Amino acid sequence: PLDTERGYHIHFKGFEHLLSRPVVFANRGFGITPMEQGLRVVGTVEFGGLKNPLSKSRIKNLVNNAKYMLDGLPEHNDEWLGFRPTLPDFLPVIGNSKNYKNVFYSFGHHHLGWTLGAISGKIISKMISNEKTNLDLQPYSSLRFT
């Protein structure tokens, strides 16, 4: 049941000088990071598949939040939509194939792929080497959906 989580961001070019570091506005559910391309505003995801168009209402939400927090921003100049493999229970699949002993899975980390990739890789490397992990990997089994 692998699905597609779609994450959005926008840029305000030329205003990266307004912030010296990334800032998260937790009460409004978004963040802003100064980058070479300008201020990058992030903070919205959805399940929307691979073929549906970009959601203008999600972009508008990012724009409104950014302009509320940083008065005087112009119109944004870039909209982006990226895809992340996600499972319905938001847990990745980590483990070996039931059909092939030499096939191991590590996918479905949704928007935490960069964060959890190294940890999952270490677990998989221990599994390949037949080392104990001291972890209960049952919740991450690919068989949980059968």
Positions of predicted regions on the chain:
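Active-site substrate-recognition segment that forms the wall
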Residues: 1-101
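C-terminal lid/capping helical subdomain adjacent to the catalytic/cofactor pocket in oxidative enzymes
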Residues: 13, 93, 98-146
